[in-house]
A protein has these predicted regions:
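Cysteine/selenocysteine-centered motifs that mediate thiol-based redox chemistry or coordinate metal-sulfur cofactors
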Residues: 247-263
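Short cysteine clusters
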Residues: 29, 33-36, 208, 228-229, ...
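Short, intrinsically disordered/low-complexity patches at protein termini
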Residues: 101-103, 243, 249-252
Length: 263
């Protein structure tokens, strides 16, 4: 129902036993969303050869991932090799996925390469969108509607105000799936939105669904491998094997403090 919001912190499609792959191919963006950690990162792209090497590494370590998500803290379609990367993913037998802001004009280029995609849209109000740092709302809506006639589209909405319900109604009327995502509670996100700090009590014992179920591997712009896409302050990242060891003794890594996805 349109008045019932699906709340989720996941940004990936469902996965199988082999972990999916998410690659931060760019930190550049044509939006300036106040909640985005990427706006304070160095603005740059991942080299195509580096991406191809990471894909080969993942294949050798884990096998063919069910999904390779081309996204991080930037707008993926700004990368000049975005569709080339998607083609490479298909060539190895996987399925490319992305979450785009929907401003790319040549929407038809997605059809032969993608089985499904995500589009971010937080509000239907141009005024509210501008306050958030989002633009070209009519173009985004047109992008969603046109592409939804060719493939499943999921609209991702950050839970900021009542605008999420208006987006839910808009999606419901068009038969489009929507996922509403809360703001992250981690310090490496929170500094950008102190007025919206999520209120929740975190358990002392540490458990992480990404580590338990081996859901995915996230590769940031520098090629660093992590178990999820929520670790932005990599100085505190102890490494994948150390995180698994810490989980076994219910010890929370510093890089996971405040994370909504951990117990």
């Amino acid at each position: 129902m349109a008045d019932q919001l699906i709340i989720s912190s996941f940004s990936e499609p469902p996965v199988g036993q082999i972990p999916s792959m998410q690659v931060e191919i760019t930190t550049r963006c044509n939006f300036d969303c106040f909640y985005c950690a990427g706006r304070d990162m160095p603005q740059q792209d991942m080299d195509y050869q580096a991406f191809s090497g990471l894909l080969d590494y993942h294949l050798s370590q884990y096998g063919v991932p069910p999904v390779v998500s081309l996204q991080g803290e930037g707008e993926p379609t700004l990368h000049q090799d975005f569709f080339r990367m998607a083609t490479r993913v298909k060539d190895v037998g996987s399925r490319p996925f992305t979450i785009t802001n929907g401003t790319y004009k040549q929407w038809q280029k997605f059809i032969p390469l993608f089985d499904f995609i995500g589009v971010s849209m937080d509000t239907l109000s141009p005024e509210e969108a501008k306050k958030i740092g989002r633009y070209n709302l009519p173009r985004v809506q047109d992008f969603i509607e046109k592409l939804a006639t060719h493939m499943p589209v999921t609209v991702y909405t950050v839970l900021l105000s009542s605008g999420a319900k208006a987006v839910a109604q808009w999606c419901h009327e068009r038969g489009i799936r929507q996922i509403v995502q809360p703001l992250q509670g981690k310090p490496d996100y929170q500094y950008r939105y102190p007025q919206f700090i999520p209120r929740f009590i975190q358990k002392e014992d540490f458990s992480c669904v990404y580590l338990h179920q081996n859901l995915m591997r996230y590769y940031d712009l520098n090629g660093r491998e992590m178990p999820c896409c929520f670790i932005k302050d990599t100085k505190q990242y102890p490494g994948l094997q150390e995180m698994k060891r810490m989980q076994e003794i219910s010890q929370r890594p510093a890089c996971c403090t405040g994370c909504l996805m951990t117990g």
